[in-house]
């Protein structure tokens, strides 16, 4: 069974039916790839998907419902734009125009915030960024509200689009990655 435009996936581990999006599982295994186009993602690859794919919610009458992605049993449809990363041979690779940035520790001694605003270290790039001379390990700046938190291999990372990265800091800033304890406990 293959879908024309969507991947068919199954969650790795439990789906979770907790209402907060931060606690919904977003790791899946690819069962089938779309028929309509070729993709770098193959059957059996692990992928990180949007939190609404496996989401369970309650309608206006209080009845428990599956997300629109639900197919049957433990299988779900997943659109191309709902996939952010895929893993093959122990290496995570970005998919499409997504990239992942590690937050950095806040050096401002007058601030109570632990993470610096709008700055990070590129961890997982893509071909668009590489073509612009922005590579993993570079200190970058990004636009406000563009980052979504993900925990990837027990590390807190921000997912964003390539166009959200607006500057590469060329001089040595001595930035240090921030990773909270809660990210390591997942």
Where in this protein do the model-derived segments appear?
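Acidic-enriched and Gly/Ser
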Residues: 1-186
